[in-house]
């Protein structure tokens, strides 16, 4: 039986959240492919250019768009929430690669978690804040 030495696969991890979407992001040295839940990024994000540019924007800020493949497991929320969660996860993963990446990413706002979530409905109201129509008589 031969013993093979395997080269360790270098990957950098980052987790992003937005609304109810959670994205677990892996950056692997590659040529700039985006794979989300086993599908090519263009297919998963329905060929929407703004979603794709949001996902790639942290890499483009640092000029590394052709150096790393983005592999994502995204759950919850819709496409917008998932795309922005992926963006945060990519930015966090880039910070683990090199701490000098943190300043330009922070300056662009990629490391800030958007904390806005849907407000809960209250009893006695129709929605979170919408009250039933008031009738004086």
From Swiss-Prot:
Tell me where it resides.
Answer: Plastid, Chloroplast
Mostly located where? plastid
Q: Biological process (GO) annotations? A: translation
One of the entry's Gene Ontology molecular-function terms is:
RNA binding
Please name the InterPro entries in this protein's record: Ribosomal_Su5_D2-typ_SF, Ribosomal_uS9, Ribosomal_uS9_bac/plastid, Ribosomal_uS9_CS, Ribsml_uS5_D2-typ_fold_subgr
- Entry's transmembrane regions: none
Lineage: superkingdom: Eukaryota
Recite the UniProt keywords alphabetically.
Chloroplast, Plastid, Ribonucleoprotein, Ribosomal protein
Cellular-component GO terms for this entry: chloroplast; cytosolic small ribosomal subunit
Family membership, please give it: Belongs to the universal ribosomal protein uS9 family.
**Name of the protein in its database record:** Small ribosomal subunit protein uS9c
Organism name: Mesostigma viride (Green alga)
């Amino acid at each position: 039986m031969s013993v093979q030495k395997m080269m360790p696969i270098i990957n950098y991890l980052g987790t992003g959240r937005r609304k109810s979407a959670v994205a677990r992001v892996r950056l692997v040295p590659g040529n700039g492919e985006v794979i989300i839940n086993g599908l090519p990024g263009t297919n998963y994000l329905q060929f929407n250019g703004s979603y794709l540019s949001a996902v790639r924007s942290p890499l483009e800020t640092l000029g590394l768009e052709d150096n790393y493949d983005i592999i994502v497991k995204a759950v919850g929320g819709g496409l917008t929430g998932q795309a922005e969660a992926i963006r945060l996860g990519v930015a966090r993963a880039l910070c683990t690669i090199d701490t000098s990446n943190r300043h330009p990413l922070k300056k662009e706002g990629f490391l800030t978690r958007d904390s806005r979530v849907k407000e809960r409905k209250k009893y006695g109201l129709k929605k979170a804040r919408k009250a039933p129509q008031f009738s004086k008589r």
